[in-house]
Amino acid sequence: MMKFKKVVVGGTFDRLHLGHKALLRKAFEVGKIVYIGLTSDDMVKNKPYAEKILPYERRLKDLIEFLEVNNFRRYRIIKINNAIGFTTRIRSLEAIVVSEETYKGALLVNRAREEVGLRPLEIIVIPIIKSKLGDKISSSLIRAGLIDPFGNPIKRE
């Protein structure tokens, strides 16, 4: 049920996995228009296994492919260079969709919005999705070669 006109979600979206997909699905479930902040190559330099993160253009292509396959049409993808991104420039945003892990980022966004006189966003939190190893599914574990994008352990030979 669409509750908001404009929602925002952000991330690196490297090697799209079940957690990313759940986050995006929730955003489209609650928002009429979804603004997606996609991190620039500069922004990901300090992430774990940064050298294995796919380049921005590839992550953008994979993200668009996922959106099209799922018939998500009402979106705008914007390159971001920091955690606040465009959230202080688009006054009409109403909500932000995050995981339990990225909840603190939503608080930073709201603080930044309030500092420039904008209304804070309603925060919608989705649970973290666990891998079959018991850890959360993360791009870092995928880049490390420990799990696949579905959370299955990768067998070493």
Curated annotation (Swiss-Prot):
One of its GO terms (molecular function) is pantetheine-phosphate adenylyltransferase activity. Pathway: Cofactor biosynthesis; coenzyme A biosynthesis. The keyword Transferase applies. InterPro entries: CoaD_Thcocales, Cyt_trans-like, PPAT_arch, Rossmann-like_a/b/a_fold. GO terms for cellular component: cytoplasm. It holds the Pfam family CTP_transf_like. It is found in: Cytoplasm. Monomer. NCBIfam families: CoaD_Thcocales, cyt_tran_rel, PRK00777.1. Belongs to the eukaryotic CoaD family. This is Phosphopantetheine adenylyltransferase.
